[in-house]
Amino acid sequence: FLLLIIGVLPVYAQKKSKEKIYRLPDDLETLAGDPALLKKPEGLTVAAYAFPNYHASALHNKIYSQGWTEYNLIRSARPWFEGHQQPRTPLLGELDESKPSTWETYNKLCKQSGIDVLIWDWYWYDGKPCLHEALENGFLEASNTKDVKFACMWTNHPWYVLYPTKRTDGSNAYPPSFDAP
């Protein structure tokens, strides 16, 4: 999940006493300095995507290596230009998305940040769900799951390997075909 949405200020930021609409990223410094400027319009539902790739899974074990997660990419990031600070460390550390305690933290942060709904990528390959552990074992088992609604988005595409790994040459999509339940 790490999702890179936790703690992000919503784009709907608006000042109560003025008609000015604040826009990100231009007004980020102003908004971050004064949380009173943030106001969620009545009836607006804010959703964020949940990409379940920060936990060990059978899919990763098959394509990459045993225990591989997206954190491997974060750790191996290198600067592309002067001033580009890489690798970066996740603010909360490397949390395992398949654990309810991780989602208790994320759900609390979502609620505090005005995020109402998480839209989960849902993968189905080789006749079974893939990368489902974060939703089924983590999010749905968290004690505060009712604080954040959720929906599943069917990700009806092959898994593309877009970067070099130890176990593939990066040129093939996995699986060659996908199926539906």
List the model feature ranges, each with a label.
Residues 1-16:
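Bacterial Sec-dependent N-terminal signal peptides
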